[in-house]
Regions:
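Primarily membrane-embedded glycan-assembly and transfer machineries that use lipid-linked glycans
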Residues: 1-19, 31-37, 49-140, 146-155, ...
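N-terminal hydrophobic segments of proteins, predominantly signal-anchor/transmembrane helices
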Residues: 23-31
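Short helix/loop segment immediately N-terminal to the Walker
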Residues: 104, 108, 179-185
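Short helix- or helix-capping micro-motifs
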Residues: 22, 138-144, 190, 194
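Membrane-interface alpha helices of multi-pass inner-membrane proteins
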Residues: 149-152, 169-172, 181-208
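Catalytic and binding regions of secreted/periplasmic enzymes and modules that target cell-wall glycans
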Residues: 46
């Protein structure tokens, strides 16, 4: 029915309908209880750790009074967060702004996610236009997507902020690839994404290619890949110094690899192994499967 209202992708009303649908489906989620994830409660706990002058890479949320009642998942209570310095600093600022009130903090985390979602939609539209694709059609795959809304607004995941910076880096590197500053600007956005969640690093090679320019030779591509890596490393060092967290996020990358969830592919394999092997032999097999999973 909504598609019928939109009509052709190129009609003037199509964009208005796309925005209206996305907004109407997203707005209630801003005020709803968090669903599908307890990550925002962990963000609050990490913000509390920061607000009390502790390094979250060395001190888990379990050191904060009443952390269990505040909703943080006990699975990660003593684990360093797999997030970068920008994410942790934003968590601290939000907790301080909310006066350490958990309900208000969660609402502010939601607002930050809404800001990031708007940024994602903006950059998707710009990238679609830059590559000759219909903006409305590109946005339709993302904006009104229930999984997108549930993960980035209802659950308030910081992946939304990371994704916004990743897309911003690609867009500015593409948009200003003929200038001397387009590539560095793209790398800076990727660095901000990495400083939220290190997974953003996967787009750095593509930003390096855009910085190298059209029809670049392989030696030139490698040179700009190296330049991109050096610039990102320098910017990460600067952000680590400014926040006092340095490169603690590198060691924390193994945090999620130390646990497994039963319904994930490797969790299912480990669960199946537990049906046939017990005791020390099972621990050996479990560690082997976890090592393979980390490698992949």
């Amino acid at each position: 029915r909504i598609y019928q209202k939109m009509g052709d992708w190129n009609e003037p009303n199509a964009m208005r309908w796309m925005i209206a649908v996305t907004a109407s489906w997203s707005l209630p989620q801003i005020f709803a209880f968090t669903i599908y994830s307890r990550d925002m409660f962990s963000y609050y706990g990490q913000g509390m750790v920061m607000a009390h002058g502790l390094n979250p890479y060395k001190h888990g949320v379990s050191e904060i009074s009443n952390f269990m009642q505040n909703g943080a998942d006990p699975m990660w209570a003593e684990s360093p967060p797999p997030y970068g310095p920008v994410s942790l600093k934003l968590e601290e600022w939000i907790v301080r702004l909310a006066g350490e009130n958990i309900d208000l903090s969660l609402f502010y985390f939601r607002l930050l996610s809404v800001f990031a979602v708007i940024g994602i939609l903006f950059y998707v539209a710009k990238l679609a236009q830059a590559h000759g694709f219909n903006q409305v059609r590109a946005l339709w795959q993302i904006g009104p997507n229930p999984l997108f809304i549930a993960s980035f607004i209802a659950s308030g995941h910081n992946d939304s902020l990371m994704t916004m910076f990743m897309l911003g880096g690609l867009y500015y590197a593409k948009r200003y690839r003929d200038t001397w500053w387009g590539g560095p600007l793209g790398v800076t956005f990727v660095a901000l994404g990495v400083a939220v969640k290190p997974l953003a690093l996967v787009v750095l090679p593509f930003v390096g290619l855009l910085w190298a320019g059209k029809n670049a030779s392989w030696p030139r591509k490698f040179i700009f890949w190296v330049l991109s890596g050096v610039l990102l490393l320098a910017e990460m060092a600067l952000m680590g110094w400014a926040t006092g967290l340095e490169f603690g996020w590198i060691k924390a990358l193994s945090t999620t690899g130390g646990q497994y969830i039963w319904y994930t592919p490797f969790g299912l394999v480990i669960g199946a192994a537990s049906l046939f092997v017990q005791g020390d032999a099972f621990e050996v097999i479990r560690k082997l499967i976890e090592t393979v999973g980390k490698g992949i």
